[in-house]
Every structure is written in C-alpha cells, then in structure tokens.
C-alpha cells in the first residue's frame, strides 16, 4: 500500500488456536472477552488476518460467520480483516460500520505471487487519499461507480515473501461507500488491460487498515457469487487508459519537480508531477522523482 505496508505474519495452526473471543448468553452476543491475538487463521469458515506493529492500542475480534470488529486508539499501523485464502476473481458483498478518525482504509485487499503484487480495491478511506503518491493508469466502471486505477512500487518493503520489491495495484472508488458488492473480476480484467497483470492468488480479505489514527470498524463479509476463475471471461463495463504519469492532473513541465525532487506525500502542497523520471513513493510523507 502507498502510505503503509504490512507483512501479515503467518503462524502455525497450533499457534493460532484461540479461545472463542465472545461471550454468549442464551445465544445472544453480549461482550467480547478479549482481543484475538495477532496472526492468521480460520474462524467460522473464513480466513482472517490481523497484523499490528504494536504501536498504540488495537483490539480485534472475530465474530460470527464473516463478521469482525476492530477498535484502535493512537495506533501506529495495523491491518485486519476476514476473507479467503486463496482469493479468487469473485464477487464480494460487505457491510461495514466504518468510523475512522484519521488515516485509514476500507478495502478488498490481497496479494498475488508470480508476480508478487499487493492490491487494493479501495471503497472508503479516512483523511488521506493514497492517490497522491501513485501513478494513474486509467479508469474503469463497475458496481455503479467509476474507479481510478493506479500503480505504485514498493522497494525493499515487507511482503508475504519477506522483504522484497513489488508493485501495488489500486482501484479507488470515486464515491466512498461502506457497504455493497465488489465485482473483483472487473477490476482484475481492467488491470490486465492496463498492463497490470496478477499472478497466482494468495489471501484476499475485506480489510480495515489504520495508520497513526484512531477509530472503529465492524465489518461483515460474504461471497456474493459470480466468477471465481483467476482470469475473468468478461470485463468491466468500460475501461479507459491514461498516459503514464503522476496521479494528479498533468501540469506544465515548468511546474513539475525536477529529477530527485519531492513530488508527493501527506501534507505536501508542491508539484505532484515530474519533469524527469517518475514519481515514486518512498514513505507516508515523501515521494520522489526517480
């Protein structure tokens, strides 16, 4: 991801064996007993991942079926969610009570291997739009909205294969929403048309993510049916391409940053294009023309 990237550490089934994290009375959910420990595992038929770098307070609980909840306060960085491992080009239904205060994402999030790719279908976010540090590739129309497609590169960053250099693919919805159906096959097909192919699916979750922020999120995930093959036989209703360049609208060369100059980052008010090179994400606060 563009503003914070997470390595979801796989642990053995024995390590992840958990006491059920909810108390029940006459079949009714009363209170969570304790936070689910960080790690990966299965819960009520769904794969889940919970990673935190330990900063601030983050409490994650698995709920019934595809439900989970997470509350965070002054958290440094975390990613949590439920879904599938492996993922697929499926339609995913979700509902969320998503209440971020600061930098946060609500997305369909996953990885592929060969090539190693981290991807986001971003449905809602907090105060930071990651597009400012990404390269715009085109647009697609799916599920009643336009999505802008972006690409980013992470260099020597954590991944599901350890520290690595890999690409990120993003679809960012033009109108935020906290519930609906995401036809992932449309995004995967559009990305391929735009020169952004996925490889073999790894895990795929509806994730809540936070970075130096607070908030709460309760999400229910369900498969909505539809295509489950790695390559969708049908594509989105429309796809358009844009020339390679920064995520913002093109600016005259004279107003773009020079090679090795800053071109993005949270709070950056200067040029977001490069007169030479490409705007590359470095960290949450700094992107550079390289």
Swiss-Prot record:
<feature type="active site" description="Nucleophile">
    <location>
        <position position="118"/>
    </location>
</feature>
<dbReference type="InterPro" id="IPR013320">
    <property type="entry name" value="ConA-like_dom_sf"/>
</dbReference>
<feature type="active site" description="Proton donor">
    <location>
        <position position="209"/>
    </location>
</feature>
<comment type="function">
    <text>Endo-1,4-beta-xylanase involved in the hydrolysis of xylan, a major structural heterogeneous polysaccharide found in plant biomass representing the second most abundant polysaccharide in the biosphere, after cellulose.</text>
</comment>
<feature type="region of interest" description="Disordered">
    <location>
        <begin position="223"/>
        <end position="248"/>
    </location>
</feature>
<feature type="compositionally biased region" description="Low complexity">
    <location>
        <begin position="234"/>
        <end position="248"/>
    </location>
</feature>
<dbReference type="InterPro" id="IPR000254">
    <property type="entry name" value="Cellulose-bd_dom_fun"/>
</dbReference>
<keyword id="KW-0732">Signal</keyword>
<dbReference type="GO" id="GO:0031176">
    <property type="term" value="F:endo-1,4-beta-xylanase activity"/>
</dbReference>
<keyword id="KW-0325">Glycoprotein</keyword>
<comment type="similarity">
    <text>Belongs to the glycosyl hydrolase 11 (cellulase G) family.</text>
</comment>
<keyword id="KW-0119">Carbohydrate metabolism</keyword>
<keyword id="KW-0858">Xylan degradation</keyword>
<dbReference type="InterPro" id="IPR035971">
    <property type="entry name" value="CBD_sf"/>
</dbReference>
<dbReference type="Pfam" id="PF00457">
    <property type="entry name" value="Glyco_hydro_11"/>
</dbReference>
<keyword id="KW-0624">Polysaccharide degradation</keyword>
<feature type="glycosylation site" description="N-linked (GlcNAc...) asparagine">
    <location>
        <position position="26"/>
    </location>
</feature>
<dbReference type="InterPro" id="IPR001137">
    <property type="entry name" value="Glyco_hydro_11"/>
</dbReference>
<feature type="domain" description="GH11">
    <location>
        <begin position="34"/>
        <end position="222"/>
    </location>
</feature>
<keyword id="KW-0964">Secreted</keyword>
<feature type="signal peptide">
    <location>
        <begin position="1"/>
        <end position="19"/>
    </location>
</feature>
<dbReference type="InterPro" id="IPR018208">
    <property type="entry name" value="GH11_AS_1"/>
</dbReference>
<dbReference type="InterPro" id="IPR013319">
    <property type="entry name" value="GH11/12"/>
</dbReference>
<keyword id="KW-0326">Glycosidase</keyword>
<protein>
    <recommendedName>
        <fullName>Endo-1,4-beta-xylanase B</fullName>
        <ecNumber>3.2.1.8</ecNumber>
    </recommendedName>
</protein>
<comment type="pathway">
    <text>Glycan degradation; xylan degradation.</text>
</comment>
<dbReference type="GO" id="GO:0030248">
    <property type="term" value="F:cellulose binding"/>
</dbReference>
<dbReference type="InterPro" id="IPR033119">
    <property type="entry name" value="GH11_AS_2"/>
</dbReference>
<feature type="domain" description="CBM1">
    <location>
        <begin position="255"/>
        <end position="290"/>
    </location>
</feature>
<dbReference type="GO" id="GO:0045493">
    <property type="term" value="P:xylan catabolic process"/>
</dbReference>
<dbReference type="GO" id="GO:0005576">
    <property type="term" value="C:extracellular region"/>
</dbReference>
<keyword id="KW-0378">Hydrolase</keyword>
<dbReference type="Pfam" id="PF00734">
    <property type="entry name" value="CBM_1"/>
</dbReference>
<dbReference type="InterPro" id="IPR033123">
    <property type="entry name" value="GH11_dom"/>
</dbReference>
């Amino acid at each position: 991801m563009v503003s914070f990237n997470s390595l979801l550490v796989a642990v053995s089934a024995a390590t992840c064996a958990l006491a059920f994290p909810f108390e029940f009375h006459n079949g009714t959910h009363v209170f969570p007993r304790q936070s689910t420990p960080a790690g990966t595992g299965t819960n009520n038929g769904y794969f889940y991942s919970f990673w935190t770098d330990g900063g601030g307070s983050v409490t994650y609980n698995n709920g019934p079926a595809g439900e989970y909840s997470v509350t965070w306060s002054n958290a440094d960085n975390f990613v949590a969610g439920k879904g599938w491992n492996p993922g697929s080009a499926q339609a995913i239904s979700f509902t969320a009570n998503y209440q971020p205060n600061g930098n946060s994402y609500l997305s369909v999030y996953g990885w592929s291997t060969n090539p190693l790719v981290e991807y986001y279908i971003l449905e809602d976010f907090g105060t930071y739009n990651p597009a400012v540090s990404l390269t715009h590739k085109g647009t697609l129309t799916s599920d009643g909205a336009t999505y802008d497609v972006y690409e980013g590169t992470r260099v020597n960053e954590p991944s599901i294969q350890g520290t690595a250099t890999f690409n990120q693919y993003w679809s960012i919805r033009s109108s935020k929403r906290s519930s609906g159906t995401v036809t992932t096959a449309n995004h995967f097909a559009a990305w391929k048309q735009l020169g952004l192919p996925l490889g073999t699916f790894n895990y795929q979750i509806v994730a809540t993510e936070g970075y130096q922020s607070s908030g709460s999120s309760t999400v229910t995930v369900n498969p909505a049916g539809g295509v489950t093959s790695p390559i969708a036989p049908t594509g989105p209703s429309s796809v358009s391409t844009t020339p390679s360049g920064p995520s913002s609208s093109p600016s005259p060369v004279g107003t773009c940053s020079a090679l090795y100059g800053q071109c993005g980052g949270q709070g950056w008010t200067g040029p977001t294009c490069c007169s030479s090179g490409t705007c590359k994400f470095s960290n949450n606060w700094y992107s550079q023309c390289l």
